[in-house]
Amino acid sequence: MFTPVNDDGTVNLTEMEKLIELIITQKLDGIYLLGSTGQGFLYAEAERKRIAEAALSITQKRIPVMVHVGALSTDESVRLARHAEEHGADAVSSVGPIYYAASPAMGMAHYRSIAASISVPFFPYQIGNAPMTEEMIRELLEIPNLKGLKLTTLNMLDIASIRISSGGRWTLFSGADELMCHAALCGTAGAIGSTYNLFGPVCKHVRQAFLNGETAMAMAFMLEFQQLILEILPCIWTFFRRGMQLRYGIDIGKAKAPLMTPELAWSDEYLMERIRRVESYLPQLNP
């Protein structure tokens, strides 16, 4: 989920509440808080706790919330994980060690420490195309409350390999929006990504329709969706910001530095035309 921000970079709680209520109204399956899209790494620990508290207070268990707690130090991740559980998070997620070159042993120690500090389900967040070894999977399977993974990779065989090696015991989420249907073929149970803030209902519909056998429609949608992603990727934040304003009346604000992308002034006509093309795959909008 986006973390809406004010001009000074602080969290905009008013817009965040509007976004959360929108997601609940749309009957999406959950909220992933303070991940890459939510700019979690760009907030200090105290601000991350404040955002988590506010979001969990708003949701009031009306929708599952997974809080991302990845940080530079394992100790901070542990504090954030405990805080999230104390305030009602349904699950916790974390990337592996960052900045310092991490060995598999470092990653395992990091994940074990976070998981041991909480009782709610834990979902490591694997980013990149580095494969997860059989040994790593065996060790992760020994962590009692590790219930799955978020996998942001373009390598579908890696996702399938993890599904096979884990014996189907884990709930896997794909993180590459442009491959959400492809990943479903490899055993993912759902998808977590930035574009679902704007296109959540249609993406949920298409993914389920694909699983139900509507492959021609899903292929047509995915090509349309992938074309859009390729077009907007260089200036994706400005597209999201204006798109959310036009479609839902929600201002997510500018991206926090250094995440800012080039400030491209997308025309409202172009934005709405592209949004309509993607949303045309929703039955209620295309009778």
Task: Tell where the protein language model's regions lie, with residue ranges.
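C-terminal alpha-helical cap/extension of soluble enzyme domains
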Residues: 1-2, 22, 26-28, 37, ...
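Active-site beta->alpha loop and helix N-cap motifs at the rims of alpha/beta catalytic domains
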Residues: 3-131
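A general structural signal for well-ordered alpha-helical segments in protein cores
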Residues: 16, 48, 52, 77, ...
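Catalytic alpha/beta core domains of metabolic enzymes, predominantly
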Residues: 113-117, 128-233
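Solvent-exposed, flexible loop/coil residues
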Residues: 6-9, 15, 47, 103, ...
